[in-house]
Amino acid sequence: MKTKQPMVPIGYIQFIASLLVILVHCGRLAENSGLHFLLKSLLCSLAVPFFLLLNGYFFQKSTCSWQQWCKRQLKLYLRWSIVYLPLGWFYLGQQNLADSLRVIGLATGFFTVGVWYHLWYFPAVLFGMWLVRKTRFLGYRRQFLLAISLYVIGCLETYSSYLSGPLLVFYQNYRTLFFTTRNGLFYGFLFLLCGFCLGEHQKRPFFTKHLGRKLAVSLCLLGIEGRLVYLNQGDDKNFMLFFVPTTLFFLAWLIKQQPPKRTWQAKQAAEASRLIFLSHPLFLETGKVFFSLAGFPLFFYTIALTGAFLGLRKVGSRLNSYTVGFAKKTVDEKKSV
């Protein structure tokens, strides 16, 4: 008799991934360098690729148009950019920049890396998804060849310590101008394309058979790659080649486990994960500035305040719904008199 596999709603994994995003922003996580690298550069760094894959997957499954999707993403991005604008202004002021240069810096940041460190995600998603759509005429084979080539170029950031000669000069010149290769062109494009492809072909054997073995092999290869990077670390560790198959096969496995109907709890977890991702720096920065917290103390502090914020927001939403409903009922009663 076959044992029934437990179902793991994607919303719960989104929630866990959002906590990993908080953790990656908390500074040093362990005194032991190897453990710190394992937690921050391998485990936590899988969260954003997972979110990008999900975005590509849900976009392919969505019935809304490209314009509607863009409008929704831009509204969300603009709203939270306004929230973080004072922090971005203050940070640039600490760099002793004149007000005019701060304005230019924030305007440039809005279109490239965001006005605060986590908001780079929106320009990357928007531009990456635009690339996915604009290169559809190539077919998947050539699309993936292009996306993988760009991702490998992006990996120069991680493997910069291994570079020399003209390649090193090229990378340094690029970094001087654009700061990072973690953007929609070199980073987001491939993960979004993988998610889009998974959404279109999720029933194919490649995405349904032997997923446990594929995931295990990917994790082993990621461990080997992580060891190579750890021994000779580059400017940053945002890119690793085996982030791609690891997150892709993990999401394919998750999709197989989904219950027939999305539960209320899973929806709430997914919504909470989005708000945690967007709001957590507001609370994290207070812990760093006012209490000099770092590592896991800062992580738990941020979770506590972010959780309180989510709770208050939920209460406010309920009260607002009750007030609107009560007002409508009162008006209807007066009309009927």
Feature annotation, model-predicted:
Residues 1-337:
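Alpha-helical transmembrane segments and their immediate juxtamembrane cytosolic regions
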